[in-house]
UniProtKB/Swiss-Prot annotation:
Belongs to the intron maturase 2 family. MatK subfamily. PANTHER family: MATURASE K (PTHR34811:SF1). One of its GO terms (biological process) is mRNA processing. It comes from Apocynum androsaemifolium (Spreading dogbane). The gene is matK. The lineage of its organism: Eukaryota, Viridiplantae, Streptophyta, Embryophyta, Tracheophyta. This is Maturase K.
């Protein structure tokens, strides 16, 4: 961010409304490539950096505004350089540069908001790290789940209209509108099988994610409002406390006035759902109550989105299910809500009573069957989970073989350290350990038993460290104090970056 300010010299107190002139600045594209936005394009086109000039960008924008330029047939695509290979190259340049420019005002706004102390920021609710407290929170009062599939926008113009509330620059929005429309039209001329929206998703990922996140955040505004009004985790400053008193006062007044006419609809406003999380195109809501209450929430949200955001949510894509009968795939984890019996001892005078209460608890388990299938595909074991050797690695040295197996084992241990039950994780580590031993024994033309007896059974413990040892290396000062706390479940916030398991469907 300091690098951007050094080039742009923008004042934080002013909202940068005029972003259109920045598109013609050559250093914008140099900054975009300097942040490793899309290195695949550089590999496919070696001379890509040399073509990022003011003249090419200006010519491209001029061509986009010439409507007759796009009225070509499929046979002329080989003769027209813009419809051919250069069209993809220039469009990627504009999309990367535009996405980098549009992020500038949002970065400025985020920095200015962080400087204000004592104000609750709802942006934290939309972070991917909000999934971890969702997985560990108490589910004792929730019995119903509403699973909503987030639909794609029916038209690309909706993405531009969503961005219009954030960027007050008409020329930039017009350029984005022309770019999306004409670029998708050119794609339909070349290949009519791929829709323009899907093609934009695959070929211009950074621009798509930027527009799609704004699109999702707009319709999520109702969730943020309900969470900020009903959450008990907000800071207790004077302004927030007064706002909370006014909110509950309005609810009580509403209940007194309309209790006679609408006695069954009060719970819809008095007890909103308390859990919300979004992951991989799904919105998941947890609430307490009956199925009738969730159906009311479902109808209310669908009508609210259709009337205010032009978001068409089909009723068949919104599922209402019982919490304790539903499993959920989250970031490579298999999450299952189970009822755990809790025994409470109560004593009155000389009589003692044992009260058993079932409590819903979310167990994050390691998906052992998909992992064994992946290991079998990678030739670490067979389909039954029995470890086998890897003949491909017998040409390597012993240290390289152990380092490669140990890196995979430590990565999985690091990733699945937040699982509530470690039995499946230990089985995965056993498969890797025995596969490594069989590979080394095959290299030295010996049996596994003789190889382990000759070197000892502890020769692999150095690189197969457990999650507690990883935590002790990461936080050496506090590990001794919180040894018992972090022995069961440890969440590492960087697992979404170091492992592709978080992005699997």
């Amino acid at each position: 961010m300091e690098e951007i300010q050094r080039y742009l010299q923008l004042d934080r107190s002013q909202q940068p409304s005029f972003l259109y002139p920045l598109i013609f600045q050559e250093y914008i594209y140099a900054l975009a490539h300097g942040h490793n936005l899309n290195r695949a394009i550089l590999l496919e086109n070696p001379g890509y950096d040399n073509k990022s000039s003011f003249l090419i960008v200006k010519r491209l924008i001029t061509r986009m505004y010439q409507q007759n330029h796009f009225l070509t047939s499929a046979n002329d695509s080989s003769q027209n350089p813009f419809i051919g290979r250069n069209k993809n190259l220039y469009s990627k340049m504009i999309s990367e540069g535009f996405s980098f420019i549009v992020e500038i005002p949002f970065s400025m706004r985020l920095i200015s908001s962080e400087e204000r102390k004592g104000i609750f920021q709802s942006h934290n609710l939309r972070s991917i790290h909000s999934i971890f407290p969702f997985l560990e929170d108490n589910f004792s009062h929730f019995n119903l789940m509403l699973d909503i599939q987030i639909p794609h926008p029916v038209h690309l113009e909706i993405l531009v209209q969503t961005l219009r509330y954030w960027v007050k620059d008409a020329p930039s929005l017009h350029l984005l509108r022309f770019f999306l429309r004409e670029y998708c039209n050119c794609n339909k001329i070349i290949s009519t099988k791929k829709p323009g929206f899907l093609f934009l998703t695959k070929k211009n990922q950074r621009l798509f994610f930027l527009l799609y996140n704004f699109y999702v955040c707009e319709y999520e505004s109702i969730f943020v409002f309900l969470h900020t009004q009903s959450s008990h985790l907000r800071p207790t400053s004077f302004g927030v406390f007064r706002e909370r008193i006014y909110f509950y006062g309005k609810i009580e007044h509403f209940a007194e006035v309309f209790a006679k006419d609408f006695p069954t609809n009060l719970c819809l406003f008095k007890y909103p759902f308390m859990h919300y999380v979004r992951y991989q195109g799904k919105s998941i809501l947890l609430s307490r109550g009956t199925a009738l209450l969730m159906n009311k929430w479902k109808s209310y949200l669908v009508n609210f989105w259709q009337c205010n955001f032009d978001l068409w949510v089909h009723s068949r894509r919104a599922y209402i299910k019982q919490v304790y009968n539903y499993s959920l795939d989250f970031m490579g984890y298999l999450s299952i809500v189970r009822q755990t019996p809790l025994t409470v001892r109560s004593q009155m005078l000389k009589n003692a009573f044992l009260i058993k209460n079932p409590i819903n608890k979310l167990d994050t388990l390691v998906p052992i069957i998909p992992l064994i299938g992946s290991f079998a595909k990678a030739k670490f074991c067979n389909l039954l989970g029995h470890p086998i050797s890897k003949p491909v690695r017998t040409d390597l040295s012993d240290s390289d073989i152990m380092d490669r197996f140990g890196r995979i084992c430590r990565n999985l241990s690091h990733y699945y350290s937040g699982s509530s039950k470690k039995k499946s994780l230990y089985r995965i580590k056993y498969i890797l350990r025995l596969s490594c031993a069989k590979t080394l024994a095959r290299k030295h033309k010996s049996t596994v038993r003789a190889f382990l007896k000759r070197l000892g059974s502890e020769f692999l413990e150095e690189f197969f460290m457990s999650e507690e040892e990883v935590f002790s290396l990461t936080f050496p000062r506090v590990y001794s104090l919180f040894l018992g706390v972090y022995r069961s479940r440890i969440w590492y916030l960087d697992i979404t970056c170091i492992n592709d398991l978080a992005n699997q469907q």
